[in-house]
Amino acid sequence: MAMNLLNTASIAKEMQTKVTERMGDWFEAEFKAKANSASRRTRLIRSHGHTYTYARYQNTGQLSSNLKQVKKGDKIVVNAGTRANYTSGYHGMYFLVEKKGMQDVKTTLKKGANYANSMKL
């Protein structure tokens, strides 16, 4: 009687790497899109009877080009670089201190969980 022996450990390892790679790609693309939209977000200032607009965090546009996937062991981390990677003196992720930026991260993480559950391999 021949039994079909499946190497479940190697199958699980292969599935884990595929899911990790796909999730890393998805999060990188999603955060790049959010960073680009944040760089276009402007502020309105009303002063002396005039309305002025300016982009509060101008180097968040550089954030999308600085986002990279870094493989650490079995995991993939989406890294945004350090302050030295940006032209201004602050990091490109500072747009997250605003309410809209925090909402962007919450919705992205929620969408990420839904994407992982609906993923077909």
Swiss-Prot record:
GO biological process, one term: viral tail assembly
Subcellular location: Virion
GO cellular component annotations of the record: virus tail
Keywords (A to Z) from UniProt: Viral release from host cell, Viral tail assembly, Viral tail protein, Virion
Protein task: Plays an essential role in tail assembly by capping the rapidly polymerizing tail once it has reached its requisite length and serving as the interaction surface for the connector and the tail tube proteins.
Entry similarity comment: Belongs to the Skunalikevirus tail terminator protein family.
Quaternary structure and interacting proteins, as annotated: Homohexamer. Interacts with the tail tube protein.
Protein name in UniProt: Probable tail terminator protein
Organism: Lactococcus phage SK1 (Lactococcus lactis bacteriophage SK1)
